C-alpha cells in the first residue's frame, strides 16, 4: 500500500516500470505514494485506472510521515499532521500512517496520540524496516484501537516492489 517512483527525491524508478514490476509479481493494484508529490501518481492513474491508487506521503510540520490514499490534490510538505489528515478526509481520502514507530520518519509513534482519532489504517508491516519489533508495535497499537492494519514494500527501487502487500477483495 506504499510505493515510490522517481518523483520522490530518493527514488529513481520510472512509474510505468514500477507498475510493470508490480503486475509481474502478481499485484493488481499499487498505491503510488511519492514524497510530497502526486503528479506521477495522477499521470499513471490516468493511463491505468484499474491498477493505480493515487496517494501522497506527506512530511508533516512535526517531521513525521502521513499518507493520503485516494486523493486528487497535493498536500504541501510541512502541513501540520492533524491538518494533513483533515485535508485528506476533505478529499474523500483515507488516512494511512506508514512506519509509525520508525525513529525519524515515524517519530517513534509520538504523532499517533495527536492524530489517532483520524487514522483509517496503520502500516503494520513495512518491508524496509529491519527491526521486527517496530512493525509489531504498530500492529499492537492498531489492534488496541480496532484500526485496520496494512502492509507495504515502501519500494524505492524496482527490486523492492512486491516485498510487502495486502490481499483484499477486488474493487
Regions found by a protein language model. Give the residues of each.
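Charged catalytic cores and adjacent phosphate/nucleic-acid-binding surfaces used
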Residues: 1-20, 39-43, 47-54, 60-77, ...
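Divalent metal-dependent hydrolysis catalytic cores, especially in the metallo-beta-lactamase
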Residues: 18-36, 93-96
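Short hydrophobic alpha-helical module
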Residues: 91-94, 125
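Aromatic-lined carbohydrate-recognition surfaces of secreted/lumenal glycan-active proteins
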Residues: 96-104
Amino acid at each position: 500500500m506504499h510505493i515510490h517512483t522517481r518523483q520522490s527525491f530518493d527514488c529513481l524508478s520510472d512509474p510505468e516500470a514500477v507498475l510493470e514490476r508490480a503486475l509481474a509479481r502478481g499485484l493488481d493494484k499499487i498505491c503510488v505514494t511519492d514524497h510530497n508529490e502526486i503528479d506521477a501518481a495522477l499521470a499513471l492513474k490516468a493511463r491505468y485506472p484499474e491498477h493505480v491508487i493515487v496517494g501522497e506521503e506527506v512530511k508533516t510540520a512535526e517531521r513525521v510521515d502521513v499518507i493520503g490514499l485516494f486523493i486528487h490534490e497535493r498536500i504541501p510538505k510541512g502541513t501540520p499532521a492533524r491538518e494533513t489528515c483533515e485535508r485528506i478526509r476533505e478529499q474523500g481520502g483515507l488516512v494511512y500512517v506508514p512506519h509509525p514507530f520508525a525513529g525519524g520518519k515515524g517519530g517513534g509513534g509520538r504523532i499517533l496520540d495527536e492524530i489517532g482519532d483520524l487514522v483509517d489504517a496503520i502500516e503494520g508491516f513495512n518491508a524496509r524496516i529491519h527491526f521486527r519489533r517496530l512493525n509489531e508495535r504498530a500492529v499492537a497499537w492498531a489492534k488496541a484501537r480496532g484500526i485496520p492494519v496494512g502492509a507495504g514494500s515502501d519500494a524505492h527501487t524496482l527490486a523492492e516492489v512486491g516485498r510487502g502487500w495486502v490481499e483484499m477483495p477486488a474493487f
